[in-house]
């Protein structure tokens, strides 16, 4: 905060009774005295504003979205606004206007003494303004001169709101009824943008069937969590301070649960006897098969659930999923219209001179391969407020914040002023500008964002010339398309970047029908947390529960016969399965040696570097201290089947490996076939032999090999041309001879 007294805040009149009352408490229950009130701090960065809110011009606004959980009610609120503003303003006429859900709650005047510095201001907010979903608006009203010739787009008109600004909410708990109709709340609440942490309560010695059912349920919660990510700590006892999921047969459930008689697959919401005010989601049945049916009913949404408990009938999970048909992935067999990429058509429209980019998320399979080097074609159709003369108005097309192409927007034509128009039908392209863009294939990964950034230059041409008060507008037509259909599915593995970003190759089938998860015979709580959390990530990446995942133990791997891709999770330093595969492993971790500090044997048998084989390379490293590794290799004895192993020197270190998947900066460092995690850092290596999966047509293989040798390709082209010419010459000679004979 800058020195000196902060500027005064002018607050709006106190909200009247007509303001929206807290929807959560009115709809589902009254505030609960069983749980203490809490204070929640929501930095703007956690609400999606990772960069400063840049307000430009005489009148510019930005909004931040914030939710209030269903089981909480706001009792007090304040906005801690951190901002800076131009020192060139006329301060009596310039200010920030703050609103909540469209209602102005305060104006923040600017002070000349604070200009150009960072200022922090606390703004009280009446809690009755808050509902389930809320928009916090900040609008800049700015002037730099008292002259009527002021340019509303002058560069002196600016203010920046820092992403460290906070919305601080005092919240009281709300007692929710035990009602299945509220699911997935309160175990997952879409109003909460934070990391989902949901404990699972499993029997002390859970069998494989129970663990498989728990994994399917975790993948469903992971799909719901999406970008928030989800962690699933495991215990055999009820948590004393949280909600939880309890899963198992009726005979293995914890004591003290208030449940009806179990006469079949049962879903129930009950109070947590160990934590007053908290809830339990109980998934049970008389047998493991009934537990599985209850899970399938819940994750598929095949039944309209209500009341505290419901006994469900057998559910058909449907046909197995086809390759590459994950709901969260784009279709790669046809062009995709932009309307399929947004939930609201208004997301394709912007207004103002320098609006935020139109952002379209594109998640595609990681093994898309462009055999001829061609890019991703986009047919882009857009409209905009045409400038009266050629200026600096542009449309920039970017992929993952990298510029692909920029278009200068053409000025208005003479016929645009005739005053007669026809409203275009959706199928009629008149009135739009169409451009074809080709995104380089090497810039497209499994998770991408396409950014369409309009810059609409000011129309002010002279010192005292007027401009339109209505801001410029631009829109991208929903029938613009992007097309991945000419790519083939082909990838060189192992590549842990594919796994860390999209779960490939396991997520090739959204229901994980070609995946087996291998756990130790006696898994620890950390092993099970890693198992459930990784299946949660699979659901996050695909948007579909892992209905057909198979759970196996080390002794079951041989019986699989190389028919599955394997995800191996073992936090012990001496895994018998990994020891059996030691010849194929790119990395081997030894356990503790001697007394005192842990001695870690880290063996790397380096066989590949920079595309060149090194059959005699190798290293053996010993160090003190724990670590965890992520390793990928081809399943020994199979053809194209993959193994990804999560291992550690001790079970507790698996948590550090799980932390990596929640931090984009660390995920970006996971590459190659070995990723070593220690002390919050990731070191990636490529040390093993590569193998390929997928299919490339014969003509593509010929072209790929030929393209590696351009001189040979040129010589072959010359020879082919000569042979073609000689053949044509011979044919023409025979034709001429026949004519002479006639």
Please place each PLM-identified region on the residue numbering.
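Solvent-exposed alpha-helical segments and adjacent loops
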Residues: 6-742
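N-terminal Sec signal peptide cleavage junction
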Residues: 1-3
């Amino acid at each position: 905060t800058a020195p000196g007294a902060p500027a005064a805040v002018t607050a709006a009149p106190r909200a009247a009774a007509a303001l929206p009352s807290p929807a959560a408490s009115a709809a589902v229950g009254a505030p609960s005295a069983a749980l203490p009130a809490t204070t929640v701090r929501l930095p703007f960065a956690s609400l999606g504003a990772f960069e400063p809110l840049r307000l430009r011009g005489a009148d510019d606004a930005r909004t931040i979205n914030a939710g209030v959980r269903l089981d909480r009610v706001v009792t007090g609120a304040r906005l801690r606004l951190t901002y800076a503003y131009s020192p060139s303003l006329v301060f009596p006429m310039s200010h920030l206007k703050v609103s909540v859900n469209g209602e102005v709650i305060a104006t923040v005047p600017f002070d000349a003494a604070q200009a150009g510095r960072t200022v922090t201001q606390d703004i009280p907010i009446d809690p009755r303004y808050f509902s389930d979903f809320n928009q916090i608006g900040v609008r800049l009203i700015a002037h730099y001169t008292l002259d009527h010739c002021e340019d509303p787009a002058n560069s002196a008109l600016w203010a920046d709101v820092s992403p460290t600004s906070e919305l601080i909410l005092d919240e009281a708990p709300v007692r929710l009824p035990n009602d299945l109709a509220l699911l997935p709340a309160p175990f997952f609440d879409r109003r909460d943008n934070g990391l989902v942490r949901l404990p699972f309560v499993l029997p002390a010695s859970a069998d494989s069937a129970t663990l498989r059912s728990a994994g399917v349920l975790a993948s469903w919660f992971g799909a719901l969590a999406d970008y928030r990510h989800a962690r699933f700590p495991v215990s055999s006892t009820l948590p004393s301070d949280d909600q939880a999921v309890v899963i198992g047969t009726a005979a293995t459930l914890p004591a003290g649960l208030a449940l009806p008689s179990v006469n079949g697959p049962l879903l129930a919401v009950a109070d947590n006897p160990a934590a007053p005010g908290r809830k339990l989601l109980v998934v049970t049945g008389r047998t493991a098969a009934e537990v599985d049916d209850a899970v399938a009913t819940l994750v598929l949404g095949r039944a309209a659930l209500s009341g505290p408990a419901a006994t469900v009938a057998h559910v058909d999970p449907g046909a197995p999923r086809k390759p590459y048909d994950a709901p969260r992935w784009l279709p790669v067999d046809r062009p995709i219209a932009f309307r399929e990429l947004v939930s609201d058509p208004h997301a394709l429209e912007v207004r103002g001179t320098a609006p935020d980019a139109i952002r379209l998320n594109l998640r595609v399979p990681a093994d898309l391969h462009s055999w001829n080097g061609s890019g991703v074609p986009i047919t882009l159709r857009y409209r905009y407020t045409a400038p009266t003369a050629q200026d600096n108005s542009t449309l920039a097309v970017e992929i993952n914040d990298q510029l692909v192409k920029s278009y200068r927007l053409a000025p208005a034509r003479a016929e645009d002023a005739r005053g007669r128009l026809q409203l275009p039908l959706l199928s009629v392209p008149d009135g739009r500008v169409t451009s074809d863009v080709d995104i380089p294939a090497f810039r497209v990964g499994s998770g991408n964002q396409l950014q369409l950034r309009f810059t609409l230059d000011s129309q002010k041409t002279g010192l005292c010339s007027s401009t339109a008060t209505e801001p410029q507008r631009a829109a991208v037509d929903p029938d613009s398309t992007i097309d991945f259909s000419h790519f083939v599915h082909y990838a060189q593995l192992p590549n842990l970047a594919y796994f860390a970003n999209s779960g490939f190759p396991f997520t090739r089938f959204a229901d994980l029908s070609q995946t087996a998860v291998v756990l130790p015979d006696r898994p620890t709580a950390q092993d099970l947390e890693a198992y459930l959390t990784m299946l949660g990530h699979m659901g996050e990446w695909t948007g579909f529960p892992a209905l057909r995942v198979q759970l196996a133990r080390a002794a079951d791997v041989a019986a699989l016969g190389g028919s599955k891709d394997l995800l191996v999770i073992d936090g012990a330093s001496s895994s018998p399965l990994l020891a059996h595969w030691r010849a194929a492993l790119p990395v081997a971790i030894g356990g503790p040696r001697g007394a005192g500090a842990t001695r870690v044997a880290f063996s790397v048998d380096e066989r590949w570097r920079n595309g060149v084989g090194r059959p005699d390379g190798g290293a053996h490293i010993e160090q003190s201290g724990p670590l965890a590794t992520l390793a990928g290799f081809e399943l020994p004895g199979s053809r194209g089947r993959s193994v990804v192993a999560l291992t550690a020197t001790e079970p507790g270190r698996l948590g550090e490996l799980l932390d990596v998947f929640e931090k984009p900066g660390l995920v970006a460092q996971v590459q190659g076939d070995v990723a070593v995690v220690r002390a919050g850092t990731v070191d990636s290596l490529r040390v093993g032999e590569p193998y390929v999966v997928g299919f490339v047509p014969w003509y593509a293989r010929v072209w790929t090999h030929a393209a590696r040798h351009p001189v040979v390709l040129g010589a072959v082209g010359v020879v082919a041309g000569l042979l073609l010419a000689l053949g044509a010459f011979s044919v023409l000679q025979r034709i001429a001879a026949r004519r002479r004979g006639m």
